[in-house]
C-alpha cells in the first residue's frame, strides 16, 4: 500500500512536530502548515490524501479553511483535531464537511487509528465508484 500523505494544519509548533514525528514513524508522509491560509494553499498545491486541521488558528481558522476546500473538493477526508469540544463546535465541524472530529487532549494511537480508518473508507468508496462506472460502461456497451 502506498504511503498516506497527510496535510497537518496546526499552529502549535511543538504539537505539530510531535504529531509529525509520530506519524512519520508509522510511514505517513507529513506536510505541515501553521495556519489556515497556508493550509489552504498547500492543500491545493499538494493534493494530500487526508487533511488534519486544528480549528483555532491565526489568519484563517480551520472551519473557514475546510469550508473553502469543500467548495471544490468533497472527497478528501478531513479530521478536525482541536480543543474546541463544545457540541455546537463538533456539529459545525461535521456540517462543514469533516469526516471525523478528535478533541484535544488525544492519544497518538487514537489519531493513527482514525487516520487509517478514514483512508480505508475513502479507498472503499473509490473502489465502489470505479466498479459502478465500469458496470455503467459495460451496460452501455451491451445496448
Set out the residue ranges of the language-model regions:
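Short, Lys/Arg-enriched segments at the junction into DNA-binding effector domains
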Residues: 4-5, 117-139
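Conserved acidic carboxylate
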Residues: 10
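Acidic catalytic/metal-coordinating carboxylates
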Residues: 35-38, 61-64
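Active-site beta3 strand of CheY-like receiver
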Residues: 46-52
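Receiver (REC) domain active-site loop signature in two-component systems and cognate sites
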Residues: 55-57
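Charged docking surfaces used in two-component/phosphorelay signaling
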Residues: 17-25
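Short hydrophobic/Thr-rich beta-strand motif most characteristic of the beta2 strand and flanking loop
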Residues: 27-34, 42
Amino acid at each position: 500500500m502506498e504511503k498516506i500523505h497527510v496535510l497537518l494544519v496546526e499552529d502549535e509548533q511543538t504539537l505539530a512536530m510531535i504529531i509529525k514525528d509520530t506519524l512519520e514513524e508509522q510511514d505517513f508522509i507529513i506536510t505541515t502548515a501553521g495556519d489556515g491560509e497556508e493550509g489552504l494553499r498547500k492543500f491545493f498545491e499538494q493534493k494530500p490524501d487526508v487533511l488534519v486541521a486544528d480549528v483555532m488558528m491565526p489568519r484563517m481558522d480551520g472551519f473557514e479553511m475546510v469550508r473553502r476546500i469543500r467548495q471544490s473538493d468533497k472527497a478528501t477526508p478531513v479530521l478536525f483535531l482541536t480543543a474546541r469540544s463544545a457540541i455546537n463546535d463538533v456539529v459545525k465541524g461535521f456540517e462543514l464537511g469533516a469526516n471525523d472530529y478528535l478533541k484535544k487532549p488525544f492519544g497518538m494511537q487514537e489519531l493513527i487509528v482514525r487516520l487509517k480508518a478514514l483512508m480505508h473508507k475513502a479507498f472503499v468508496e473509490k473502489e465502489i465508484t470505479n466498479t459502478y462506472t465500469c458496470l455503467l460502461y459495460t451496460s452501455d456497451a451491451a445496448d
